[in-house]
Amino acid sequence: VPLRRAGTRLLAATVTAMAAGIVAGLLARLLMRAVTVLAGGEPGFSLAGTLAILLVFAGAMLPGAVATAFGRRRSGLVLLGLGAAVLMLESVAIGLQENPGQLFGSGGTTTVLVVLVMLAFPPVILGEALAVWRMTSALAARRTVPAPRDDARARR
């Protein structure tokens, strides 16, 4: 892969991983806040915490995005899947760090709401992985410089 094309593909991978990571990270941050509220905790947004979540969500998708941008579609899918699995594991672990006894011991409505909030994490994360794969594939397929036309071939 020529250096210019490699740079373009790397940029496409980085931009798509960052864009999808920001959107999915913000949605996950809101879901984490909902879990905190349901646990009876004091919800708070720290800028450092939010930026860390956005960075983790973007960083988890970057290896898969780079592999996809360089035409390694299967490797890209595997890496995106692994990144999504890590994010799901961490999302559940962080959600359950809030007082689990309070979350599931309250019974009734609170338990149902907690389960619904926890079930919202996988679609957000899988949506992020799918968006990264599709956007990276589309951007990497675009040419940066049009190929020179051979007039003799064009006339045939």
For the regions a protein language model found, what residue spans apply to each?
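Juxtamembrane/disordered regions of integral membrane proteins
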Residues: V1-R156
